[in-house]
Regions:
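Phosphate-/nucleic-acid-contacting segments
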Residues: 158-225
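Cyclic nucleotide-binding regulatory domains
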Residues: 12-13, 38-100
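Polybasic "coupling" helices that flank or enter modular domains
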Residues: 117-188
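Cyclic-nucleotide recognition modules
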Residues: 21, 27, 73-131, 135
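Residues that scaffold the ATP/ADP-binding catalytic core of kinase and kinase-like folds
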Residues: 61, 83-84, 114-115, 156, ...
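Residues that recognize and position ribonucleotide moieties
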Residues: 32, 51, 73, 97, ...
Length: 225
């Protein structure tokens, strides 16, 4: 399998303008295709590898003792998978499953650590990544305990939205599916569908083929509880 032009975009983000970092990543990485639905990592695995998503989407998932699926997060192109286990030397704490066909750069854990030791800017970016993920996990734990299912959906919609040309509106683009939104939050699809339909009836959102528009961001934010 050969490197493609799009692959280099994911690497360039972490190279941070330093050509040597990008070249070092390519030198130690091998490419792998992961079909949709395939487990890249299984909980409890003791793999000596780190993964950089070049294309596609990977979902981090754990299962409760009763078999209930809990979605920890969704990782897109340009994001790392398995970096914590590489740094701690521990077993993998969650499943990593391809949500769509994906291309992955596979790095030996030792090479990943060497990159951090060699390039300070790379180490700083990885440290920032770990801090952001810890903050996101803490936020989700708080929301799970403090908010209703509807409140968590409202909060996630605002979080995923970006401003558009109309300063009074927010946009979710590309448009998420109800199934994807439910999975992100570990909420039943039927519940999520009812909440979204209610927002449409209240004329707070408009669902279009390519995007969702939040017509009244403040009103939606005020409903979070």
């Amino acid at each position: 399998m050969n490197w493609e032009d799009g692959d280099l975009d994911a690497i360039a983000h972490w190279a941070n303008g330093e050509l040597a970092i990008g070249e070092a990543i390519q030198a130690v990485a091998r490419l792998r295709s992961v079909p949709s639905g395939t487990a890249l990592i299984r909980e409890g695995d003791e793999l000596d590898e780190v993964y950089l998503i070049l294309k596609g989407t990977i979902s981090a998932i754990v299962y409760s003792s009763s078999g209930h699926e809990i979605r920890l997060g969704t990782l897109e192109a340009g994001e790392w998978v398995g970096e914590v286990a590489a740094l701690t030397g521990g077993a993998r704490s969650a499943f990593a499953i391809a949500a769509r066909d994906s291309r992955i750069a596979v790095l030996p854990a030792a090479s990943f650590i060497t990159l951090m030791e060699t390039y300070g800017s790379f180490a700083t970016q990885i440290s920032r990544l770990l801090s952001e993920r810890l903050a996101a996990t803490s936020r989700r734990m708080f929301e799970f305990a403090a908010f209703s299912a509807a409140g968590r959906i409202y909060s996630e919609m605002i979080r995923l939205s970006v401003p558009g040309q109309d300063a009074e509106q927010l946009y979710l683009s590309p448009a998420p599916s109800v199934t994807e939104l439910a999975a992100r939050l570990s909420i039943a699809r039927e519940t999520t569908s009812r909440v979204i339909s209610r927002l449409e009836r209240m004329q707070l959102i408009v669902r279009e083929p390519q995007q969702w528009r939040v017509l009244a961001p403040k009103a939606l934010s005020d409903m979070i509880n």
